[in-house]
Amino acid sequence: MKCPFCSHSETQVVETRISEDGDSIRRRRQCASCQKRFTTYERPDVAFPAIVKKDGRRIEYERAKLLASMTLALRKRPVSTEQVDGAVERIEEKLLMQGVRELPSARLGELVMRELKKLDKVAYVRFASVYRSFEDIDEFKTLVDEVRR
């Protein structure tokens, strides 16, 4: 594997670990030229369902996009990166378990809201307000009252 620092083609694996959930392998590598270390991850190459938007367009599922939307909702909230990664893993697991080639974006949004509700109620309200396109304060009030119960 090519070194990300100096582009040298020879690197050596110095440590290998299986993730806690057993779904990926983490490898620490060291460059033979510059001696710098870096981490790589190996995961099975699985096909996630295409996401069908409200307007009928089909787009590829993107982990980075999911992570970015959750991170935005969780901005300045006391939730660790590990907790967010765990939530994303659970969402992806559910996507794969659906066993379908296409999934409505609404279903993905519901999965995200369910995970955010477990992680942080404020982040849940933030995400839901954008996802459900709240137009007035009463919609916020209804959701906040629901979360408080």
Curated annotation (Swiss-Prot):
- Keyword Hydrolase attached: no
Q: What NCBIfam families does this protein's entry cite?
A: transcriptional regulator NrdR (TIGR00244)
Which species does this protein come from? Albidiferax ferrireducens (strain ATCC BAA-621 / DSM 15236 / T118)
Its keywords, alphabetically, are: ATP-binding, DNA-binding, Metal-binding, Nucleotide-binding, Repressor, Transcription, Transcription regulation, Zinc, Zinc-finger
What gene codes for this chain? nrdR
Query: Pfam families from the xrefs?
Result: ATP-cone, Zn_ribbon_NrdR
Mind telling me which PANTHER family this protein's record contains? Answer: TRANSCRIPTIONAL REPRESSOR NRDR
What role does it play? Negatively regulates transcription of bacterial ribonucleotide reductase nrd genes and operons by binding to NrdR-boxes.
The answer to whether the entry has keyword Calcium is no
Q: Which GO terms describe its biological process?
A: negative regulation of DNA-templated transcription
Cofactors, names only: Zn(2+)
**How the cofactor binds, per note?**
Binds 1 zinc ion.
**Ranges where the ATP-cone domain occurs:** 49-139
| Record-given protein name | Transcriptional repressor NrdR
Q: Where are the zinc fingers (unnamed)?
A: 3-34
